Design a protein with these regions (language model features):
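Amphipathic protein-protein interaction modules
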Residues: 48-119
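Charged phosphate-binding loop/patch that engages nucleotide di/tri-phosphates or the phosphate backbone
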Residues: 122-126
Length: 126
């Protein structure tokens, strides 16, 4: 087991986000609930956080990246996204749960990082 020099945040969606999901879904699809969307949540590794102020600063710096990623995971057409992509919308749509200490339980496989844009570029070549 290795302690990572990172913290993590988990994204939990709030009811207004779920309402938005249901508003952009095809009319024939069954609506999703808050409990359903939060059964699995996105986790982000972030620089080490030592106190709540660090978390707030991180969110202030990266809220738009997180918000766009979460919206994209439900709807790829960004013309259907909310117009005002600001911190107020982030706070209305998303709740963050921090994990200040992160451990890697896999003793064998090294962590592999690949920039998302590189993956998208590779997929575009196929």
């Amino acid at each position: 087991m290795k302690m990572l020099n990172r913290s993590a945040i988990s994204v939990k969606l709030r009811q207004p986000f779920v309402d938005w999901i249901n508003s952009v879904s095809d009319s024939g699809e069954e609506e999703v609930t808050l409990d359903e969307v939060n059964q699995e949540s996105t986790s982000y590794l972030v620089p080490e956080l030592e106190e709540e102020e660090d978390l707030e600063n991180l969110i202030e710096d990266r809220y738009l990246d997180i918000l766009e990623n979460e919206l994209f995971s439900w709807e790829e057409d960004d013309s259907l996204w909310p117009e005002d992509m600001d911190r107020a919308l982030f706070d209305e749509f998303i709740r963050i749960e921090p994990a200040f200490m992160v451990f890697d339980l896999d003793d064998q496989a090294p962590l592999l990082a690949q920039v998302l844009e590189e993956v998208e570029d590779f997929d575009a070549e196929d």
